[in-house]
Amino acid sequence: MSQKPLHHKRRWRYYRNSRGVSPVEKFLDDLSREDAAAVYAAMKEVREEGTRVAHFIRNEIYEVRCHGKDRIYRILFSQEGKHENILLALESFIKKTEKVPDSEIRLAETRLADWRSRGKQ
């Protein structure tokens, strides 16, 4: 009888800078209850289904999009951990253009490098 592969449950973590501040959590806290619920639902889908429901941007950065009441939101994240079971939320913003702005991608890459350099805190 064949064994099923071990399932390593995914979970979201939020990047925090050296002062302990999470820009993504602050962004989410400032949203309306309805828009925050939409973002959390999209994040839950990624947690349950993996990156196949996200968009690969470049290097190790992925994007999840969701529709709020009047806006579209984007969360940039990376997979971390031994089994890539940590979904590290790096940047969040309102979608204003079709393409993800390069400045947002660079910021996510910088935050990922910072997180890794500080021992993945």
Where are these regions (language model features)?
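Basic, Lys/Arg-enriched alpha-helical interface segments
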Residues: M1-I72, G81-I86, F93-Q121
